Amino acid sequence: MSAYDIMDSMVESYSKNANHNMRRPVVKEEIVDFMRTRQAQNTGFLKELEEFAHQENIPVIPHETVAYFRLLMQTLQPKRILEVGTAIGFSALLMADNSPHSKITTIDRNEEMIGFAKENFAKYDYRQQIELLEGEAMDILPTLPDNTYDFIFMDSAKSKYIVFLPEVLKKVKVGGLIILDDIFQGGDVAKDIKDIRRGQRTIYKGLQRLFDATLDNPDVTASLVSMSDGLLMLRKNIENVDLKHIEI
């Protein structure tokens, strides 16, 4: 039985726990619609996967981020890419398709999504370019080589970004780029903690620690990008980045 044969039960389970703040864009709705409809659309298997994800309520990067990543990959042509958070493999396949000479390592712990990703990598014949590592990111990251990756994309548990960051910074090359997705949390990050729902405060606190560690840190060049639910972009400027003694 293929992964798609058991799709309904898998998707229902995943969707209950997925982060849906990407549906609360911080940019004006009409501008979001403009970016999603006027920029070049996906074709072929990427269009198929994007439509499947939308139909089944599986979070993948929205189309304005797709267009941005398409530009980044074609311009930077990174040789080694690391992704934390595979889901169904859409973003890994997008990066692979637009940087054909890259080698991509992607990490995920969710067995349901791993099943989809494996099938998609095989179905679209990207198994030689994309390596999927199964397990907890904090267990896997220390086993990967340091100063190796040109580009790292983090799209996993937002409260854990600050926990993963010290290891991730070891893995990226000096001059390399790290992008962290969904960091505005629908605008919550700009609020006082007393205005945040209790169930969201762990994420809020984790993101505030992330901002404290990076936004004014000379060891990295940081930029917040108001695209979808926000991107944090980091360029590693020196080999040993000091995260300002932030308690991890």
PLM regions with names:
Residues M1-F151, K158-I179, I183-I248:
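A short alpha-helical cap/connector motif
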